[in-house]
Amino acid sequence: MRKLALVPIQFYRYAISPLMANHCRFFPSCSCYAYEAIENHGIWRGGWLAVRRLGRCHPWNDGGYDPVPPAPSSRTSSIAE
């Protein structure tokens, strides 16, 4: 199911995005962020993170570096170490 949710993002990244100028104000780009968020957090949480990120990508936001937050399992394992 997760792989199926990633197909439209991949289509956008490789078929549509190269035809348009680079408009994303963030690094990584919003499509890369969405792909990584869904891959790491699953469809629901990753999708929510992607929607929030798209909501922040507008001309009045400065943008900048905005990585996907780590998945909960990686947070707890780094704390335990």
From Swiss-Prot:
It is found in: Cell inner membrane. It comes from the Bacteria. Residues 61-81 are annotated as: Disordered. Its main location: membrane. Coiled coil: none annotated. GO terms for cellular component: plasma membrane. It is a peripheral membrane protein. SMART domains: Haemolytic. Transmembrane segments: none annotated. InterPro entries: Membr_insert_effic_factor_YidD. Keywords: Cell inner membrane, Cell membrane, Membrane. The keyword Metal-binding does not apply. Could be involved in insertion of integral membrane proteins into the membrane. NCBIfam families: membrane protein insertion efficiency factor YidD. Belongs to the UPF0161 family. This is Putative membrane protein insertion efficiency factor. It comes from Pseudomonas putida (strain ATCC 47054 / DSM 6125 / CFBP 8728 / NCIMB 11950 / KT2440). The lineage of its organism: Bacteria, Pseudomonadati, Pseudomonadota, Gammaproteobacteria, Pseudomonadales.
